[in-house]
Design a protein with these regions (language model features):
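A solvent-exposed interaction/effector surface
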Residues: 1-132
Length: 132
């Protein structure tokens, strides 16, 4: 779900990074569901890293984010502000701007990951797939 339990996934990824001496990476969160239409506990979130380092023998899945046209929004805030913003994107921004979303998951690239910070503050770029 889209809740504080996401922190555990990020903590496990931190252990993976340290165990594999990965120092250069991006933290990416995939939002598979629209929280405006699906209950938060039923929404799927995937914590991801992007790195150029090749890691052998890992059981972690590897995938690529689908290409296409994405709207980008830069924001910062505290725990829960991202979900309020996502609600705004789907309920106000899309209708006001004449775009539609696609089935591709939206995602965030974190420059400060609130799930790993004691104060739960984040800085991120949020990307949502769009079409006319």
């Amino acid at each position: 779900g889209y809740n504080r339990s996401i922190r555990q996934s990020w903590q496990k990824l931190q252990v993976f990074l340290l165990s594999n001496d990965i120092e250069t990476y991006q933290q990416i969160g995939l939002y598979h569901d629209n929280p405006a239409v699906k209950p938060l506990d039923a929404c799927q979130y995937v914590a991801c890293i992007a790195t150029d380092k090749r890691v052998e023998g890992t059981k972690l899945p590897q995938f690529k984010i689908a290409g296409g046209v994405y709207a980008r929004f830069d924001l910062e805030g505290s725990y829960g502000d991202d979900l309020k913003f996502i609600h705004w994107v789907y309920n106000e921004w899309f209708p006001q701007n004449g775009y539609e979303t696609t089935p591709k998951p939206s995602y965030a690239i974190y420059s400060r990951n609130g799930f790993l910070e004691d104060d739960e503050k984040f800085q991120m770029s949020y990307f949502v797939s769009i079409k006319m």
